[in-house]
Amino acid sequence: VLSPADKTNVKAAWGKVGGHAGEYGAEALERMFLSFPTTKTYFPHFDLSHGSAQVKGHGKKVADALTLAVDHVDDMPQALSALSDLHAHKLRVDPVNFKLLSHCLLVTLAAHLPAEFTPAVHASLDKFLASVGTVLTSKYR
């Protein structure tokens, strides 16, 4: 459960991401594909090379979903309901992949926002991303 301090930290950190959200989302996906090659199996139709338009496009979708989650942090299940349905019923993404992408996103944010990425912010973002993952996998049951 996110504390009020966690919510404040997440909103402040995501605010610093600003117009780079899509870029950071794509970078996190690239990190995931390189570090965890089995995740590529969900994207057989994508050009997964560095800087590809498809990876950039999906990175923007990831970032937009996270922005939606930040904006609706008190009601993520409702805000992410359609996305949860998509991943559970149509795409059938293995839930472990949300943890892998979350890790890669944390690394990406730490690399780009070193001053903001304090231990407290790191912990808050980690809890937030775990909450997003829980919401996205809630309809698997």
Curated annotation (Swiss-Prot):
GO MF term set: haptoglobin binding; heme binding; iron ion binding; organic acid binding; oxygen binding; oxygen carrier activity; peroxidase activity
Domain Globin: 1-141
Annotated Gene Ontology cellular component terms: blood microparticle; haptoglobin-hemoglobin complex; hemoglobin complex
Modified residues (Phosphoserine): S3, S35, S49, S102, S124, S131, S138
Residues that bind heme b: H87
Self-association state and partner proteins as the record states: Heterotetramer of two alpha chains and two beta chains.
Family: Belongs to the globin family.
Name this polypeptide is given: Hemoglobin subunit alpha-1/2/3
